[in-house]
Amino acid sequence: MSMVYANIFLAFIMSLMGLLVYRSHLMSSLLCLEGMMLSLFVMMTVTILINHFTLASMAPIILLVFAACEAALGLSLLVMVSNTYGTDYVQNLNLLQC
């Protein structure tokens, strides 16, 4: 395993550990999810470029589109929860049920 793959994998693991440690706050969870998606994007892009997979060259762009949609939905949920309850605790999401 080259150093590039090791560093990207380490970034993914650190984001996953951050998600597990800071899971009580919504903002911290969203930042860790973005770190995971960014490391997956870089890993896919590097793998496709090194192995010359021309048919799979759209996969990182599709992943980036889904990451942007996830970030927008998460940010809107964060704004709604913080305006309603004043905090960004994940446990407040249970109170938003209709």
Curated annotation (Swiss-Prot):
Recorded topology in the membrane: Multi-pass membrane protein
Keywords carried by this UniProt record: Electron transport, Membrane, Mitochondrion, Mitochondrion inner membrane, NAD, Respiratory chain, Translocase, Transmembrane, Transmembrane helix, Transport, Ubiquinone
InterPro entries tied to this protein: NADH_UbQ_OxRdtase_chain4L/K, NUOK/Mnh_C1-like
Domain of life: Eukaryota
Transmembrane portions of the chain: 1-21, 30-50, 61-81
Localisation per UniProt entry: Mitochondrion inner membrane
EC number: 7.1.1.2
Main location: mitochondrion
Top-level class of the enzyme under EC nomenclature: translocase
Catalysed reaction equations from the record: a ubiquinone + NADH + 5 H(+)(in) = a ubiquinol + NAD(+) + 4 H(+)(out)
GO biological process, one term: ATP synthesis coupled electron transport
Function in brief: Core subunit of the mitochondrial membrane respiratory chain NADH dehydrogenase (Complex I) which catalyzes electron transfer from NADH through the respiratory chain, using ubiquinone as an electron acceptor. Part of the enzyme membrane arm which is embedded in the lipid bilayer and involved in proton translocation.
Family, similarity comment: Belongs to the complex I subunit 4L family.
Name of this protein: NADH-ubiquinone oxidoreductase chain 4L
Gene giving rise to this polypeptide: MT-ND4L
